[in-house]
Structure formats: structure tokens, C-alpha cells
Swiss-Prot record:
Family annotation (Gene3D superfamilies): Aspartate Aminotransferase, domain 1 (3.90.1150.10), Type I PLP-dependent aspartate aminotransferase-like (Major domain) (3.40.640.10)
Post-translational modification N6-(pyridoxal phosphate)lysine, affected residues: 210
Protein name, as recorded: Probable L-aspartate decarboxylase
Family annotation (InterPro entries): GrpII_AminoAcid_Decarb, MfnA, PyrdxlP-dep_de-COase, PyrdxlP-dep_Trfase, PyrdxlP-dep_Trfase_major, PyrdxlP-dep_Trfase_small
Catalytic activity, reaction form: L-aspartate + H(+) = beta-alanine + CO2
Cofactor: pyridoxal 5'-phosphate
Length: 355
């Protein structure tokens, strides 16, 4: 790293179209600043941040249809997904367990399988990029500890058939984990069946630092029953608290406080307005790209995927646009809260300049 790079200012968001993180809500910024030195990993020593974590988990439970949630504010969706697999493995009867997930599942499940020493079985998706239910059913067996469904896939913004996956999981006495890390803050305002209220979901990932407008790091790990956290707990003899179910020891009090502040400021009306605006932006961009002849995947949630030649993609990156590709090389644009209609119009102007 050169000295110039070390002095580089923080990332501006005026051309960021690929990230699932966004600018935090002002109230979340202020709250995070006040709790920079606190550690929710030691709740007896830091009771104020521990209280805020309990309140944040309660509000997340309200969002996902769980009246008595158990969980904590994690570093992000990767940690929450790993913890879901870890809890299921620890509660399973089998010695060598497997995890069944759709091929569209986040790459964090590959990390979880590697770290935890479990087998990851990936089922293909159907023609609309959702989990193929029949393929999932073919992959589960008596050693399956957890079946994974995604509520808002990273690449195409699709929602897997969660109730059907729940039936498959129940048939082999496995947990059902829903990864709603990105989609969890928009799905309450849709007709999708995805939450704890819609199916016998055991665990869920939902990230306030994505569509929740909380500062990074602020993920969420939620469980239906306390036994899930018991399966994760280890003794912590030198702390004021006796046990700890979290993956990290020292954790971000700023993330906890910021998450609670954004939840209090925006749930439900602010998040409803945000969903309507971001979904409208996604539909606008999809329609404009389709009108220009690109093959576009219909945006079910605020994410647009479209076929785009590599030369055009690279030229747009050279213009400063932070864009990414799916595994099948489609252009991927995430319409996060910081993405405005004016930003998308400027992006389209640069697309037109390539013609």
C-alpha cells in the first residue's frame, strides 16, 4: 500500500450499485458513536449495551414474525449462517451431518462447512433462480442437520419456497434455516411466505447493516427456541457472565446501539417507504435496460440482473461505477436506500454513451 492509498478518504456512495451495505441512518450513526468502547460480549460488565441488544432482538423478532425471539446482534450474515449450521450440528444425533442448500445460497455456507467439518450438498435452482424443491428432497437424508432456504438471494433477489422447504426439513427431523440477511427488511411489505410466522423456521439471518440502515457491523442471528442458543453456549470463567453463545467474544457495542437506533427510527413506516422507493427504482432500471435490448430478470425485490457484454461492463467500471456480476456473468445492480433515481439515470446515460 502506498502512502497515497493510506490517505484515501472513505468510500462515497454516489456510484455504488453493487453493495448490499448502505449509508447508515443519522440516528444510528449517533448511537454507534456513543457506544464505541462497549462490548456486548460481556453483558454483565456492559449492561447498557446488553439491554440495547435485547431490545434490538425483540424488534427483529417483530419484523420476522417471532413473538419471543432468541438471538443476538452478530457481525453479519456470514456469522449468522455459520451459527445456524453449528447449532444444528451440535443438536443432531448423527456423527457426520450434512447441510442441504440451494446453489443460490450465499458463499458463507461453504465457509461454514469448511470450518465446522460438515458436508454441504447443493441443490440446483429452477428456471426462476429459486431452490428446486424436488432436488432438495432428493438430497436430504437421516444425517441432514439443516435445510437452508434463502429469502432474498444475493445474485437475483429471489425468495425460495420456504414452506415447502420446511416440509422437507421436518420429514427428516432437520432444522430449517432461512437466510434473510438482505431480504428481511423488505419482505414484510410483500406477499411472500418467508418468516417464522409463515413456516416452522428454526433459525434466521437478518442484517440491520444491509436494508436496515444500521452501521457495519450489525447482523442478526435469530432462533425460535432457547435450546438453539444453549447448543452454542460455552463457559466463560473469567467474565462476569457464565456462558456465551456467540461466535465472537469481544463484539461491537457500536453495531448493537446503531442497529437498535435504526430499528426504532424506521420500523415499520420508514422501512415500508424505503421498500416502495427501492422497489420502484429497481423496476425503473429493469424497464429501461429492457427497452435498450438487454435481457433482464424481473426484479422480485430491489435487485436487477441483466445480461451485458463484458466490454460494456468493464467500460462502465472504468467510468467509476461499482457494479458486479452474478456467477453466470449477468450485470447485478442492488437498489439500496442510497441509490436514487438520479443515480440510475446517470448510469443509464453512461450505458447509452457506449452505444
Amino acid at each position: 500500500m502506498t502512502r497515497g492509498e493510506a490517505r484515501r478518504p472513505p468510500q462515497e456512495f454516489d456510484r455504488v450499485l453493487s453493495s448490499m451495505c448502505t449509508t447508515p441512518h443519522p440516528a444510528a450513526r449517533e448511537a454507534a458513536q456513543a457506544f464505541l468502547a462497549t462490548n456486548p460480549g460481556d453483558p454483565e460488565t456492559y449492561p447498557a449495551v446488553a439491554e440495547r441488544e435485547r431490545d434490538a432482538v425483540a424488534l427483529l423478532g417483530e419484523i420476522v414474525g417471532l413473538s419471543s425471539p432468541h438471538g443476538y446482534i452478530a457481525a453479519g450474515g456470514t456469522e449468522a449462517n455459520l451459527q445456524a449450521v453449528r447449532a444444528a450440528r451440535n443438536r443432531a444425533d448423527a456423527d457426520a451431518v450434512n447441510v442441504v442448500a440451494p446453489a443460490s445460497a450465499h458463499f458463507s455456507f461453504q465457509k461454514a462447512a469448511d470450518v465446522l467439518g460438515v458436508e454441504l450438498r447443493l441443490a440446483p435452482t429452477d428456471g426462476d433462480h429459486r431452490a428446486d424443491v424436488a432436488a432438495v428432497a432428493d438430497l436430504v437424508d437421516g444425517d441432514t442437520a439443516v435445510v437452508v432456504g434463502v429469502a432474498g438471494t444475493t445474485e437475483y433477489g429471489r425468495v425460495d419456497p420456504i414452506p415447502a422447504l420446511a416440509d422437507i426439513a421436518a420429514g427428516v427431523d432437520a432444522n430449517l434455516h432461512v437466510d434473510a440477511a438482505w431480504g428481511g427488511f423488505v419482505l414484510p411489505f410483500t406477499d411472500h411466505d418467508w418468516s417464522f410466522a409463515d413456516a416452522p423456521v428454526n433459525t434466521m439471518a437478518i442484517d440491520p447493516h444491509k436494508m436496515g440502515q444500521a452501521p457495519v457491523p450489525a447482523g442478526g442471528f435469530l432462533a425460535r427456541d432457547p435450546e438453539t442458543l444453549d447448543a452454542l453456549a460455552i463457559e466463560t470463567p473469567y467474565l462476569e457472565s457464565d456462558t456465551q453463545p456467540t461466535l465472537g467474544g469481544t463484539r461491537s457495542g457500536a453495531g448493537v446501539a446503531g442497529a437498535l437506533a435504526s430499528l426504532r427510527a424506521l420500523w415499520p413506516d420508514g422501512y415500508r417507504e424505503q421498500y416502495e422507493r427501492t422497489q420502484g427504482n429497481a423496476e425503473y432500471l429493469a424497464a429501461e435496460l429492457a427497452a435498450r435490448g438487454y435481457d433482464v430478470v424481473d426484479p422480485e425485490l430491489p435487485l436487477v440482473a441483466a445480461d451485458m457484454p463484458d466490454a460494456e461492463f468493464q467500460a462502465l467500471r472504468e467510468e467509476g461505477w461499482r457494479i458486479s456480476r452474478t456467477a453466470s456473468d449477468a450485470l447485478r445492480v442492488v437498489c439500496m436506500p442510497h441509490v436514487t433515481r438520479e443515480m440510475l439515470a446517470a448510469f443509464l446515460d453512461d450505458v447509452d454513451a457506449l452505444a
